[in-house]
Amino acid sequence: ADKIFEETKKIINAFIQRITYVEFLPEILNAETLKNNELNEGIYGYEEFTDPRISNVFSTAAFQFIHSLTPSSIEFDGTETPLMDLFNNQNFLFLDTEKVAVYMMSSAGEPMDRFFSKQLTDHYFQSGNISFDLVAQIIQRGRDHGLPSYNTFRRHCGLPRLPHFYAMEAANVLKAVYHNIDDVDVFVGGMVEIPLPGSLLGPTFSCLIARQFRDTKFGDSHWYESADPKKGFNEGQLKSIKAMSAAKILCDGFGLSLIPENPFRVTSPSNPMVVCADLPGLDFQPWFLLGNQI
């Protein structure tokens, strides 16, 4: 029983790692950033002195970009529901999880830019006439955590320091809020950057996020591509794991019959619906041991 539990946990960890790096990261980072930071599949070697822990700037600022993609409402069973009505309301998740999953895969997020839904800035966890502003909270949290300025992180990433506001997008807006270019918070500066070609993010956030995912990968001795047979997988097992996809897991988990080929994107001519039954599943044959079965 312990062997089954541990091996199952190991397989699930491998799914999470692979789908995150092979399917999700290419949706936010461009090919050059992935290559330069060795985030592509097939490149791995454990680095004993690489710290895999989540950095302050990643969790507090850089990865908070995701909130810009949040829509103002969701449409469920033909009814459009404002996001504010769903905060702290998990009941709808248990009504029909399949419909929620299908909605999330079929509806595009908001554009990645410096603008956020008013549901997050004016009605976040609203109670009566009192609410929070998520963007203000992110900025304040960065200051509470002692994050250096946007320009400091540009230099940290090997990018040139910006000498004045007019080197930035939304210069007039920033100049009205900040006294000095070196006062600009890293979250604010990262959010107003022009995205790199083929990326959702500008150069600073691309750098900070890519470096974090590299550290998480190469600082993990149990990474799914490890050559250590006790920590990784044999050739047949690894081949079986690589055949699995987010689409197949969603199909099996929600009992779907059709799914977008890439569930991280909405359906389009380049991302058609595919039959779930046609997607390869996990082949357990490589886990059958001589005289023993897992």
Swiss-Prot record:
Protein name: Peroxidase-like protein 3
Any one Gene Ontology molecular-function term assigned to this protein's record: peroxidase activity
Keywords assigned: Glycoprotein, Secreted
Family: Belongs to the peroxidase family.
PROSITE patterns: PEROXIDASE_3
Glycosylation, residue list: 129
Tissue specificity field: Component of the acid-insoluble and acid-soluble organic matrix of calcified layers of the shell (at protein level).
Any single GO CC term annotated in Swiss-Prot or TrEMBL for this entry: extracellular region
Main location: secreted
